[in-house]
Amino acid sequence: MKTKFIFVTGGVLSSLGKGLAAASLGALLQTRGLSVTIQKLDPYINVDPGTMNPFQHGEVFVTDDGAETDLDLGHYERYLNVPMSRKNNTTSGAIYNQVIAKERHGDYLGATVQVIPHITDEIKSVVLSLAEGEDAPDVAIIEIGGTVGDIEGLPFLEAIRQLRSELGRDNCLNIHLTLVPYLRSAGEHKTKPTQHSVKELLSIGIQPDIILCRCEQSIPEELRRKIALFCNVDQDAVFSSVDVNNIYEVPLKFYAEGFDQKVAIMLRLPARNAQLDAWEKLVSDSDNPHGKVTVAIVGKYVDLKEAYKSLHEALIHGGVANRVQVDLRYVNSENVDDSNAAEHFKGCDGILVPGGFGYRGVEGKIAAIRYARENKVPFFGICLGMQCAVIEFARHMADMADANSEEFDHRSKHKVIYLMTEWYDFRTRNVEKRDAGSDKGGTMRLGSYPCKVMPESRAFEAYKTDMVEERHRHRYEFNNEFKEALAEKGMIFSGTSPDGSLMEIIELPEHPWFLGCQFHPEFKSRPMNAHPLFREFIGAAKKHAKV
């Protein structure tokens, strides 16, 4: 087996940044000429995060093949510039589903199905599947979600313990990310949480090879010696992961610490020098803007910024491409109406309405869109944001006062947005069919679909091609019954499915920049290659700000 495996665990508390650490390490190894992939193992019982509340889980990241996955896969794609797939994320729920299906099929020949070996074997097969095929990567980084000590994570930790034994030390590496808090009152770092976390890991049978210490400032050498002594690792295998203002600095910080070099030595990887010119330019451009624009994000999950993680990053990418700083103003759509919209959006150079589900906060989004349209503020609507733009235009420009989505009002005579009952899936070559009674999980129009772009439109100006592929996650779509009526009032449909049956992009050509898309372009934006629509949106905001 040519693939080397790196397992990343976390201790003390959650949200330490395992995903960013894994992505940054992967990026560094990639600059050494190695092929890298990353997989996230989530211990929760949900089959996938598709039906989870964004306030609990954050963003659901959608892959090209239609998997609804953890937001960390967004970090993986952005840092590696390699598309992820459903193979790159699995959960306890998915693992148990597979094992139970096999038991029902009789695959276990009457055996008593247990966590060990059946669940752990299934986990191992998911991990090892990354090393299959001629295009198997040189390195596979496996991030185990949650915190060491969580009862849900025990089968995953047992599985990686077994893999270490089966694959050998030269092919496996265990990295443990832990918190080293700095007590300002005492003026010192505290290592006790790290010691206890490693002790917990050792009790499971896993000896970390490298300890990555999340801290406010770099830890001194005497502290590294202490951690190495108590945690049974080499002193040069204890690294700092310091807080940064710009997350794209993390690979550079790791490189300065010698983190990737130590990993390469321990796994006997080719020790070519990392080529970091592109990362250095990215950070330099990001830290030295030539102006500033303010963009309002109008949503109902704004109290948890992680719910819009890819969106946030895509706007930053657009700023880097335009050499401007993008200040984001999160506005709760439940607090917006026509009477106070001017107050909420005073000083904004762009207004973005993202996706979402359910009626709560929708009228506030519509009020924000009306303000953007009437006041010539650059507007970008994504998924539900596009649908709300259609509703607003129908109500106020096409004399359809009760215009709405079928999702929100079944009694409306002008359902300009309605439930998709069937569509063609070009990947499976099947016609997918749904109705109001279908299961919620995994039943939307998901993944990458082609879009035909109309020449001489804002969209074509951005893409510079007439055919693109974008990622979708929705049940509702524009109702073509109203296409002619809205077109007569000035709306154009600049992007459609190849057969012309589904409206994917809408624009108002008389507006400085007003565009809505049914897909999620933020999932395909990259720090060194901003998505064309985000690049153009921020460019329009820059023009509005007169920067």
UniProtKB/Swiss-Prot annotation:
Catalytic-site annotation from UniProt: C383 (nucleophile), H520, E522
Catalytic activity as recorded in UniProt: UTP + L-glutamine + ATP + H2O = CTP + L-glutamate + ADP + phosphate + 2 H(+); L-glutamine + H2O = L-glutamate + NH4(+); UTP + NH4(+) + ATP = CTP + ADP + phosphate + 2 H(+)
Stretches assigned to the Glutamine amidotransferase type-1 domain: 294-547
GO molecular function: ATP binding; CTP synthase activity; glutaminase activity; identical protein binding; metal ion binding
Cellular component annotations (GO), alphabetically ordered: cytosol
Pfam family, one: GATase
UniProt keyword Thylakoid present: no
Misc. remarks from the entry: CTPSs have evolved a hybrid strategy for distinguishing between UTP and CTP. The overlapping regions of the product feedback inhibitory and substrate sites recognize a common feature in both compounds, the triphosphate moiety. To differentiate isosteric substrate and product pyrimidine rings, an additional pocket far from the expected kinase/ligase catalytic site, specifically recognizes the cytosine and ribose portions of the product inhibitor.
Family: Belongs to the CTP synthase family.
Official protein name in the record: CTP synthase
Gene: pyrG
